UniProtKB/Swiss-Prot annotation:
Alphabetical list of Gene3D superfamilies matching this protein: 30s Ribosomal Protein S19, Chain A
Protein name: Small ribosomal subunit protein uS19
Keywords linked to the UniProt accession: Ribonucleoprotein, Ribosomal protein, RNA-binding, rRNA-binding
Cross-referenced InterPro entries: Ribosomal_uS19, Ribosomal_uS19_CS, Ribosomal_uS19_euk/arc, Ribosomal_uS19_SF
HAMAP family reported in the protein's UniProt record: Ribosomal_uS19
Domain of life: Archaea
């Protein structure tokens, strides 16, 4: 079975990468479009500068270099596809490789800040009252 070709609003990835930023902005949802029309913030420009630096660089193991950033409000653009970003979630850098399907999303959507809590069974040390629970 043939592999489905990715299209964003009717355009292939190659067509999107050839477009100017203004043309791509017009294809994005309204919230992202308004944000990008105001221009990039300094921290967002820093992410774009880091991308240019590591464009063709690889680390010792042959994997692409991870671009670490705290900027969770950066919008994924077509020229970011294929890069690996370390997005900070408040505790650690979550490695995310940008796929074509992520275009138009925010970085923060891919690095969750809250995890699901799975509480343990009550026992010694769980609470102050558990000191009086008999040991098994």
């Amino acid at each position: 079975m043939a592999r489905k070709i990715f299209k964003f609003r009717g355009y292939t990835l190659e067509e999107l990468q050839e477009m100017s930023l203004d043309e791509v902005i017009e294809l994005l949802p309204s919230r992202q479009r308004r944000s990008l029309k105001r221009g990039f913030l300094p921290r967002q420009e820093k992410v774009l500068d880091k991308m240019e630096k590591v464009k063709d660089m690889k680390n010792d193991s042959g994997r692409p270099i991870v671009i670490k950033t705290h900027c969770r409000d950066m919008i994924v653009l077509p020229n970011m596809v294929g890069y690996t970003f370390g997005i900070y979630n408040g505790q650690e850098f979550v490695e995310v490789t940008i796929q074509p399907e992520m275009i138009g999303c925010y970085f923060g959507e891919f690095a969750q800040t809250r995890g699901r809590v799975q509480h343990g069974d009550p026992g010694m040390g769980a609470t102050r009252s558990s000191m009086f629970v008999p040991l098994k």
